[in-house]
Amino acid sequence: MLKIGVQSNFWYDRENPLASFEYIKSCGFDAVDFNIDNYLSTAKLNKEGLQETFFDQSIEEILAYFTPLKEAPEKTGVVISQMHAPFPAYFGGNEEVNEYIRMAMDKCFAVCEYVKCPAIVVHPPGGDTKEEEWENNWDMYQKLIPIIKKYKGVKICLENLFTTRPNRLEEGKLCAAEDQVKLLDTLNEEAGGDYFGFCFDVGHAILLRKNIRDYLVTLGHRVTILHLHDNNGVDDLHMPPYSCLANGRHHVCNWDSLVEGLKEIGYRGVLAFETFRVYSAYPADVRTDALKLIASIGRSWSKRIEGEE
C-alpha cells in the first residue's frame, strides 16, 4: 500500500506537533506534506524590503524549534514525505531578496534533512518569454545546487505552474512535459547527481486541460512527489478529488487517466493531497469526516496503482 499524505495547512498546531500528527493519523493518513512556506512571506520582502524573519535565527535555533516536529513521526509512524518551500522563490531584478531567499532555503533544506523529509518543492520562476523563463530558472536553481548538495537524502522538486492573466490562465512557458524533462536533466547533469525531481500538480494540469496520463508518462521516473486536488477547470480550488462535475454529469478531471499514468510509470511515492480548502468549504464538525474521505480515495487509488484491483 502506498502511503497517503495530506498537507499540514490548518490542522497542524505549531504548539503541539505530536497531537497534530496523532489526529491526522486517526483520519487515515500516514504521511504529511509540511508547509514550511508558512514561516516566510517572500512577497512581503520583495514589496517592503528585507526585515527580520523566522529564518534570521541560527540553524541551531531553527532545528531546536523543529525538534518536536522531528519527534512526531518517530512517535506516530506518520512520516514527513515532502515540504513546500517559501514562494515565490525568485524575483527578477531583486538580487538582494533572492540572496536572502537562498539563505532561507538553505535552512529549509537543513530542516528537511533533520526531520528525514526527502523532498521539497521550490517553485520555478516565470518569464515573459520562454528564453527568459529558462534563464530565470537556471539562475535560481543552479545557485541552489551547492546548497542542496550539503544535505543527504533531500531533493528539490520543480512543479507545473500557471500564471493568471486577465480572463484567462496561461501555462508556465517551461511547463510542457518535454521542457520539464530537459530542464530537470540539465540541472541534474550540472549537479552531478539526482538532486532535482518533479512535483506533479494534478489541479494545475486540470486548469490547463492537460492529458494527465501523457504528461506523467513523459516525465516518467522524474515524478518524485504529487499535489492531488480537484477544481472546476476555471479556479484553483484545491478540493478533494471527484468534487467537480461538468454539466452535473461528468468529472472535470479524468481521474482514471491519473491512476493509469501513475501505474504506468511505476510510481511508488506518496499519494499526497493538497486539499486545504476543505477547511473553508465544510463546517467545522464535518472536516474530520472530509479528511477521512480523502484518505479513503487515496487507499482506493493505491490498490489500483499497485495492481491489487
Model-assigned labels for residue ranges:
Residues 1-114, 193, 197, 221, ...:
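N-terminal pre-domain/capping segments
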Residues 5-7, 81, 120-121, 157, ...:
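Structural detector of well-ordered beta-strand residues that form the stable sheet scaffold
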Residues 7-11, 35-39, 85-88, 125-127, ...:
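Active-site beta-loop-alpha junctions enriched in small/polar residues
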Residues 13-14, 21, 50-54, 59, ...:
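Gly/Pro-rich active-site loop or hairpin
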Residues 24, 32, 73, 112, ...:
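Conserved, mostly hydrophobic/aromatic
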Residues 30, 79, 118, 154, ...:
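Short acidic/polar active-site loop segments enriched in Thr and Asp
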Residues 55-83, 140-151, 181-187, 254-256:
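Alpha-helix-loop-beta-strand connector modules within alpha/beta enzyme cores
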Residues 74-75, 89-197, 207, 285, ...:
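Active-site acidic/histidine proton-transfer and metal-coordination neighborhood
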